[in-house]
Amino acid sequence: ARAQLAPVVFEGTSFGGALMTTTEVENFPGFRDGITGPELMDQMREQALRFGADLRMEDVESVSLQGRVKTVTTAEGETVRARSVILAMGAAARYLGVPGEQELLGRGVSSCATCDGFFFKDQDIAVIGGGDSAMEEATFLTRFARSVTLVHRREEFRASRIMLERAKANDKITILTNKAVEAVEGESTVTGVRLRDTGTGAVSTLAVTGVFVAIGHDPRSELVRDVLETDPDGYVLVQGRTTSTSIDGVFASGDLVDRTYRQAITAAGSGCSAAIDAERWLADHE
């Protein structure tokens, strides 16, 4: 909008993305005392409105990205034409789908150790998963937690050997294998997780005040996977250090392309890069 263009932003019916379920953001520059995720998103939204961005709380049903004029069609049937499109749909953390998980999201259940680990200082917590991300999150969380129990439903791990050995060598980490999570327990906050032994069927409760789900992320690229180049997991591929995709005039940013960092500040920076790339592309294609 500051470039005197006319950006239309489709926020979806629930705007704000992953930050809307983050209780406290302490690693975003400019907020010395931290800020809640919803407050940060409200401020970003108001800033965009101040510069004239057209923000629409509508879900996008389909896109047509080929050709000089792109089109975006909403679930309500409205079609918007554009010369350039920036994709910033993000990625969604995979969840277990067990009782109590979504009800206690942000109240002891999290999918981001970097975001929320600090709030579990000197507490007993569980990390659910068996891949590299689970090992990394468990190891990271030992900086804050009194103890970390790594829960995996199988005997064998998908994690690389070095990541697994690092977790095993940490005195604060206890590893439970062949344990499936049946439910997250607690009323207003997490008090434990109910586990079922996949071999014997025995059910037990692990007393914890935090549950970090680390079973991967899925990029929200369903709308464009058939027309844009993506990696095998669905992350949109961009060219070099730019945000340009495999279609001219289409750019992608944030967690839609980033499987490594997934932080608010890196997503914001990536979005800025996409805006600059789009502005320059439009200037070159008058």
Residues covered by each model-derived region:
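FAD-site-proximal beta/loop scaffold in flavoenzymes
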Residues: 92, 97, 102-119, 215-262, ...
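A Rossmann-like FAD-binding core segment of flavoenzymes
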Residues: 45-74, 79-82, 142-240, 280-286
